């Protein structure tokens, strides 16, 4: 691990880990996060649009869906729908700009980071409803499914996988692939790594997820496949690119999904990196391992999606996309190509 990586793990162990042993205080966590958030500069040649109101939210009593666009000047040949982490109860597109900027610029993709509704005010399935509505809005605005990738980290990674399952079950066109960073896929917390890596994980104690899960679940079962996609039938999903650290308490949430997806015939590139912390790609401005992870992620995104530069169309202020071309036949080759360079 790099010196920067060791310093980040030291900081997490000293400042973040102790808080996970305390009772969950939603208001305090949100306030501290808002106070400490670091906003990276917008990359040269790109624009940040803090908007994309989606008319027709799933629940008319709630405000319309919103989020942030990071858009390449002149348009981009592909689109990423990004779902941020934060245990379903805190964080936002702003807290995840570093990972969104890094992935978008490397993948040459316009990226929409969804500001989905948070628990406990909006329990399951609110976040899933919002993710589905945002994906369908992207399609309605002209982004071909073959040029779309859904990505997410931690809770957002689990939400991304659940979104794929729900789209398949509903008969919607599926995206070209998905990128999942340290996804939280088992809200029942049955993975052996929850206990085996307790004390090794620099960020989380082992029992914190069992305390967070009820905030999101409400009255739903922890094994509902749309809340915990580890328990879903994974057949027919597009290629998956997954990363997790070897000392994560959530490690088995990645490993078991990779195993079950492969058994269901899904192409999976799964990298388990030694000692790296939860969702380390978010540290790309500071950490070389994070930059390499984003490079690999972007390569996957490019390989599974349409890349017809002649078909680019600049996005409007409301996020409307122009047409692209079909790259469905590239999907399986792309995931297999990525898998050869990333250990599983």
List each model region and its residues.
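A short, well-structured alpha-helix characteristic of acyl/acetyltransferase catalytic modules
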Residues: 9, 332-333
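A glycine/proline-hinged amphipathic helix-loop "lid/cap" segment
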Residues: 1-72, 306-312
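Residue-identity detector for glycine
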Residues: 319-324, 334
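Alpha/beta-hydrolase superfamily serine-hydrolase fold, recognizing
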Residues: 55-70, 74-313, 322, 330, ...
């Amino acid at each position: 691990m790099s010196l920067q990586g060791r310093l980040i793990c030291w900081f997490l162990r000293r400042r973040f880990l102790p808080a996970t042993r305390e009772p969950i205080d939603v208001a305090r966590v949100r306030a501290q996060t808002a106070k400490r958030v670091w906003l990276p500069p917008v990359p040269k040649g790109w624009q940040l649009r803090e908007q994309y109101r989606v008319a027709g939210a799933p629940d008319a009593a709630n405000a319309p869906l919103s989020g942030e666009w990071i858009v390449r000047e002149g348009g981009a040949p592909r689109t990423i729908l990004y779902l941020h982490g934060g245990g379903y109860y805190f964080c936002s597109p702003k807290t995840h700009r570093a990972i969104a900027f890094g992935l978008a610029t490397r993948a040459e993709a316009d990226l929409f980071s969804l500001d989905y509704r948070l628990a406990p005010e909006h329990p399951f399935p609110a976040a899933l409803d919002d993710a589905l509505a945002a994906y369908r809005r992207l399609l309605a605005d002209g982004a071909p499914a073959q040029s779309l990738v859904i990505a997410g980290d931690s809770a957002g990674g689990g939400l991304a996988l659940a979104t794929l399952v729900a789209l398949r079950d509903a008969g919607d066109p599926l995206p070209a692939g998905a990128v999942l960073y340290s996804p939280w896929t088992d809200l029942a917390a049955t993975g052996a790594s929850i206990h085996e890596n307790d004390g090794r994980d620099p960020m989380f104690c082992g029992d914190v997820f069992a305390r967070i899960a009820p905030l999101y679940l409400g009255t739903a079962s922890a094994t509902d496949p749309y809340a915990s996609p580890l328990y879903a039938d994974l057949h027919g999903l597009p290629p998956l690119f997954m990363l997790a650290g070897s000392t994560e308490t959530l490690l088995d949430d990645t490993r078991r999904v990779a195993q079950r997806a492969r058994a269901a015939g899904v192409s999976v590139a799964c990298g388990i990196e030694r000692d790296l912390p939860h969702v380390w790609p978010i540290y790309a401005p500071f950490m070389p391992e994070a930059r390499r992870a984003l490079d690999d992620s972007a390569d996957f995104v490019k390989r599974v999606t349409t890349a017809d530069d002649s078909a680019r169309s600049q996005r409007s202020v409301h996020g409307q996309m122009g047409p692209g071309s079909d790259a469905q036949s590239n999907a399986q080759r792309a995931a297999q190509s990525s898998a050869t360079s990333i250990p599983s």
